[in-house]
Each structure stands twice: as C-alpha cells, then as structure tokens.
C-alpha cells in the first residue's frame, strides 16, 4: 500500500512539474515574427495613448499587414484595424513566454501585450486600464 501511495505521489509531482515546463518548449520566434511583434507593441502603445499619427507611422512599417491601420482616418477606424493585427499577434505568441493576451469585457476585444500592467489600445485614455489578462 505504501509503494502505491509513493508511486501516485511521484507521478502526480511529475505531472505538476511538466505543466510548468510546457511553455518553455515553444518554438523560438522567427526574426520576422519578432519584428512584427515589436511593431505591434509600438502600435498598441500609440493607440493606448490616443496617438493616431504614431500608430499610423509604425503600422506603415508592417507592410501589407498594417496598411489598413496606416490609412485609417480616425482613432476608431485605427482601433478596428488593430483588431486584425491582434488576431495575428495572438497566433504568433501562443505558448511564448513574456506575452499576455488581454481581454476588455466592455468592448469585447482582445490584444497581446508584454506587460502585466494593462494598457487598453481600444479605449485609450477613456478606459486605459480596462481589461483582464486571459493568458500568460
């Protein structure tokens, strides 16, 4: 009976430890994905600061992926375009350490950021800290 309990304890410990190491086994990001995520984070920060011009400038550097946002004529239009970039960012960062998927329940929008301090790119200064980290 003691051997069975010991085996169960060891097995349970091994399973628990493997859940902590799983994210570390994610494939490294490609140079292209790193560049995209760097620009994405800059656009995120610009929109959170209500800075349309800065968001457009960085989005233009993203090429075709950022063209819709780069051509936007207003913050609401830019924020709509940002949601497409967020979909891409969520896919790229799956299982990557250091990236957080955040959800704004009021606007029903998601984005990726590198800090646990929430800065909402969809609401800017109106609701800058509205959001919940859904995935680390």
PLM feature spans:
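Bacterial N-terminal signal peptides that target proteins for export
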Residues: 1-14
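Intrinsically disordered, low-complexity terminal tails/loops enriched in metal-binding residues
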Residues: 12, 16-136
């Amino acid at each position: 009976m003691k051997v069975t309990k010991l085996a169960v304890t060891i097995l349970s410990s091994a399973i628990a430890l493997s859940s902590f190491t799983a994210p570390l086994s994610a494939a490294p990001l490609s140079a292209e994905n790193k560049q995209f995520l760097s620009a994405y984070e800059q656009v995120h920060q610009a929109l959170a600061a209500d800075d349309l011009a800065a968001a457009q400038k960085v989005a233009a550097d993203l090429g075709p992926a950022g063209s819709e946002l780069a051509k936007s004529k207003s913050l609401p239009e830019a924020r709509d375009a940002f949601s497409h970039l967020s979909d891409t960012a969520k896919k790229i960062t799956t299982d990557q350490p250091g990236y957080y998927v955040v959800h704004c329940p009021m606007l029903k929008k998601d984005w990726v950021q590198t800090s646990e301090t929430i800065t909402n790119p969809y609401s800017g200064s109106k609701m800058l800290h509205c959001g919940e980290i859904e995935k680390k």
